[in-house]
Amino acid sequence: MAQIRLSLSAMHSSDPIATAIETRLNALQASQQLSAWSLIVSFMGDAIGPRGGVVSASTLQTLMQRLGIGHGAVRTAVSRLAADGWIERSREGRNSFYALSGDVGETVLSAERRIYAASSLLPADTPKLLIISADPLSDIILRDIEAVGALQIAPQVILCFSPANALPASLQLSGATIAEASTLKRGTALGEQLAIARQTTEITELLAAYLPVSAALQQADAPSPEDAMALRCLMIHEWRRLALRVLAVPADLVQPDDPEPETRALIASIYARLLGPSEAWLDANATTPAGALPPPDARLSLRFGGR
């Protein structure tokens, strides 16, 4: 992680939105989750992806400075992202420009489908498939289980939300016994495993962190374009990390007190409030080699179930 020095003096204000930004920055720094490279990826995917995918280095530096991240940390993070194949750099005269690499395009789009989905719940009648392996599950199979959205519920038992004739190839285990059921009783043990897989503890913490942010947005005047962009970037940075790890499950298996649906709805509501002013900041400040950013494409309006 690049060393980050927060410069929060400019944020001290009675403005509740500025206070919300400062509070979240402090919390992320305290938990060692304020990663410059992750913030940059969040901004590039969330804000720049729908608007052509390319932005100037100066635009990125301006936003990161508002988030207390110095130029040196940004340069270090960009160098790391470029070396790892996440970002492509180009120059036009004296100006540098960044874009997410085409090699990670499908990864980014796949992530977006989970981050901005209207729900992480599958229909209640989604098939529940039990796969009982004849042998201990290898590390490769365990990774495949996570990748396809399945769940290990016993040492050699996998729960997969798929009909038998559509079982992912990686889970078609030789010698395995397969049992398909339209319903499955959620006992204590399974409930606890599902709670872990749905990131219940961290989702609850995120809900508690952003309820005051939502209240501040409802009570205060509209945030400045710069603060709206900064808060949007921070929130998606935090939400993205959890949304990509939440297991999508049939609605009939979800605990009544599962906090994820409420948290997703809260994030969607805040996002909608921030969208207008944050896009105005991009209109006024973000540049490409051709000038201003192009208008957003259709996928921006479809996020969180929009129309």
Labelled PLM ranges:
Residues 15-43, 105:
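Short alpha-helical segments that sit at the start of domains
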Residues 51-63:
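Short acidic, hydrophobic short linear motifs in intrinsically disordered regions
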Residues 69-80:
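Short amphipathic alpha-helical interaction segments
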Residues 85:
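Glycine-centered, phosphate/nucleic-acid-interacting loop/turn motifs that mediate DNA/RNA or nucleotide
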Residues 91-97:
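Short, Lys/Arg-rich nucleic-acid/phosphate-binding segment
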Residues 105-126:
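Short, amphipathic alpha-helical interaction segments positioned at domain boundaries
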Residues 135-227:
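Mid-protein regulatory/catalytic core that forms ligand/cofactor-binding pockets
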Residues 195-307:
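C-terminal regulatory/effector modules of DNA-binding transcriptional regulators
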